[in-house]
Amino acid sequence: MTLVNELESLVPDLAKGLDQASSLEMLEELRIDFLGRKGRLAQIMGRLPELAPEERPVVGKTANAVKESLNNLFDRRKTALEEEREAEKLSRFDPSMPGRMPRVGSLHPVTQVMDEICQVFKGLGYDIVTGPEVENDYHNFEALNMPPEHPARDMQDTLYVTENILLRTHTSPLQVRTMKERKPPVAAIAPGKVYRRDSDLTHTPMFHQIEGFMVDRNVSMADLRGTLTSFLQQVFGKDTRVRFRPSFFPFTEPSAEVDISCCMCGGKGYHKDGAPCRVCKTTGWVEILGCGMIDPEVFKSVGYDPEVYSGFAFGLGVERVTMLKYGIGDLRMFFENDVRFLRQFA
């Protein structure tokens, strides 16, 4: 038998083998046997140097044609086997069965509480204002009655970009910016991120704060108390008790700290099992925000006449409200992106 005959016999031999190949594994064995580096086609072509020079072109041409035919046979059989395997899989699939629903994401708990607070104040007639997180020294300090060398600046570890440019330490600069742009009456809240050099269980370098203020004729401390009491009872529950304690802030006079009855122990200082409350440290009260009547010096910096207008301002940390509302003990959990933690608020 000549080499040409041997080459041409490979095609029917492979066709018979493919008819018996019932799996992709068997098909691969046949491919190696016929087309592998040591397969039958390679063995025949290894004898090509034995031929006379004039015979080699004919054998080479035949070998190329046979190789193409073998590849075509393999491809067709492989396609057929893959279709059979897919059909077998589909035969076990019931399209009427319900699918698996993907997990639905949700807003971050801090965002949820911030949105809730904004909705409460929108219901009280307040506008929502926003502004730059990179502030100048004037709007962050001086216009709020904190000139250079003022001791109140030591209360805040400030992150400076340049000598007079900084990352805002509170959202109070928006009080100044808004009052410069608007004439009384003005009522607005300013939610946003603020930055301070601090990091522990209850502090992070970046956190969220909401500044609120109202200016009009004859605004009094009673208006401030009524507004904040209404707000806190809407967020923490109508049975929440609220108390005001004298305090100091450079941009308000008089100033106060606001406490609410502890959410964890119901304001009793101890839990039902007699264990002392770790949140309020058995006092029954937890600090929630700072507030006061806007200082006349702040009015002067924005062009308001303090003899005609009065107003109040308050500020609160959104993370603190969220921690108290949901009983979260470590502030850093908000920023660790632990899905197990976040899913609890979905």
From Swiss-Prot:
It comes from the Bacteria. Keywords: Aminoacyl-tRNA synthetase, ATP-binding, Cytoplasm, Ligase, Magnesium, Metal-binding, Nucleotide-binding, Protein biosynthesis. Disulfide bonds: none annotated. Binds 2 magnesium ions per tetramer. Its cofactor is Mg(2+). Its EC number is 6.1.1.20. It catalyses: tRNA(Phe) + L-phenylalanine + ATP = L-phenylalanyl-tRNA(Phe) + AMP + diphosphate + H(+). It is found in: Cytoplasm. GO terms for cellular component: cytoplasm. Belongs to the class-II aminoacyl-tRNA synthetase family. Phe-tRNA synthetase alpha subunit type 1 subfamily. This is Phenylalanine--tRNA ligase alpha subunit. It comes from Oleidesulfovibrio alaskensis (strain ATCC BAA-1058 / DSM 17464 / G20) (Desulfovibrio alaskensis).
